[in-house]
Swiss-Prot record:
Chain ranges of the DegV domain: 3-281
Species of the source: Clostridium perfringens (strain 13 / Type A)
Keyword Repressor among UniProt keywords: no
Record's function text: May bind long-chain fatty acids, such as palmitate, and may play a role in lipid transport or fatty acid metabolism.
Any coiled-coil regions, as ranges: none
Name of the protein this chain belongs to: DegV domain-containing protein CPE0304
GO MF annotation, one: lipid binding
Residues of the signal peptide: none
Key words of the record: Lipid-binding
PROSITE patterns: DEGV (PS51482)
Binding, hexadecanoate: S60, S92
Pfam families xref list: DegV
C-alpha cells in the first residue's frame, strides 16, 4: 500500500498543492471574542480587522479529536502507512495529542506503520518538508524513505521574518512588556526565527528595510554554503512587500520562491504586515 502524509493547518500549504500531492490537513482553530474559527476557513482581511479591535489576544485550539482521528483512519482503513508532521510542540499541543490518535488507530489497525514528527517549527518551514515527503510518496518511495525525507527536509528548514507589530507578541507573552515598549520607542525591528521549537529573536535593526536586507543576507549565505531547494516568501496582508522580496531574491540571488500567507495561529502573535521567508537547505 501507499504512504500517506498528514500535517496541520499551520504548515500553510496552499489548498491546490495539498490536493495535488495528497496531503491531509487537520485544522487548528483560533478563538476570538468567544467564537471559534477554523484556520482553514479564515478570511484574512476580515479576521485581522476583527483582531485589531480585541484588547485580549485570541487563543488557539487543537484539531477536534474526531476530525483528528478521521484524518488518520481514512488512510489506515485502506492499509496505508502514515507519516505525520506537526507544529512545534512548544507552540501547540497538537503533536502531543497525535500520540493519543496513533494509539487509537494502532489498536484498530495494528499492521499500519505511523511516524509522528514534532517539526520544532511551523509555517512553510514545516510545509516544505511535508510537501517533499508527499512528492516522494507519490513517486512510490517506501515508508522509511518518506519519513527520512520529511525529517531531513524539516531539519534543514529555516523561517525568518519581521513581525508587523510588537504589541501582539507582548500580549501573548512572547516578549516582555518593557522590551515591547523599548522597541516601539526606538522603532526597533526584531528579526525572528524559530530555534529548538520556540520563537526567538535572531537580530534587531532600526528599520524594516534593514531587516529585509538582513534576511536576504542570511539567505544568500545559506545559498552559497549549502544551496536551497525550496523557498516561500511568507506574509500577512503584505503582498506587495512579499512580491518585492521575492523579486529581490530572484534578481540578486537567482532564487525562485513561492508566495504564501502566514497561518492565523501564528499571525495573531506577529501581526499584520509581517513578512519573511521559509526555505529548506539542500541536505
Amino acid at each position: 500500500m501507499a504512504v500517506k502524509v498528514i500535517t496541520d493547518s499551520t504548515s500553510c500549504i496552499p489548498k491546490d498543492l495539498a490536493e495535488k500531492y495528497g496531503v491531509e490537513i487537520v485544522s487548528l482553530s483560533v478563538i476570538m471574542n468567544g467564537e471559534s474559527y477554523k484556520e482553514v476557513d479564515i478570511d484574512s482581511e476580515a479576521f485581522y480587522d476583527e483582531l485589531a479591535k480585541c484588547d485580549k489576544l485570541p487563543t488557539s485550539s487543537q484539531p477536534p479529536m474526531d476530525e483528528f482521528y478521521n484524518a488518520f483512519e481514512k488512510f489506515a482503513k485502506d492499509g496505508h502507512d502514515i507519516v505525520a508532521a506537526f507544529i512545534s510542540s512548544k507552540l501547540s499541543g497538537t503533536y502531543t495529542t497525535s500520540h493519543i490518535i496513533k494509539d487509537m488507530i494502532l489498536e484498530k489497525y495494528p499492521d499500519v506503520k505511523i511516524d509522528l514528527i514534532d517539526s520544532q517549527t511551523s509555517v512553510m518551514a514545516l510545509g516544505i518538508g511535508v510537501l517533499e515527503g508527499a512528492k516522494a510518496a507519490q513517486e512510490g518511495k517506501d515508508f522509511n524513505e518518506v519519513s527520512k525525507i520529511v525529517r531531513n527536509t524539516i531539519e534543514e528548514s529555516e523561517i525568518i521574518f519581521v513581525p508587523g507589530t510588537l504589541e501582539n507578541l507582548k500580549k501573548g507573552g512572547r516578549i516582555g512588556g518593557a522590551a515591547a515598549l523599548f522597541g516601539k520607542m526606538l522603532k526597533i525591528n526584531p528579526i525572528l526565527t524559530v530555534k529548538e521549537g520556540a520563537v526567538v529573536v535572531m537580530d534587531k535593526v532600526r528599520t524594516k528595510k534593514r531587516a529585509i536586507d538582513k534576511i536576504v543576507e542570511v539567505v544568500k549565505q545559506d545559498l552559497k554554503e549549502k544551496g536551497i531547494k525550496q523557498a516561500v516568501v511568507c506574509h500577512i496582508l503584505a503582498e506587495d512587500e512579499a512580491k518585492d522580496l521575492a523579486k529581490r531574491l530572484k534578481e540578486e540571488l537567482d532564487l525562485d520562491s513561492m508566495i504564501g500567507e502566514i497561518s492565523a495561529v501564528i499571525g495573531v502573535h506577529v501581526g499584520v504586515k509581517s513578512v519573511g521567508i521559509a526555505y529548506a537547505r539542500e541536505s
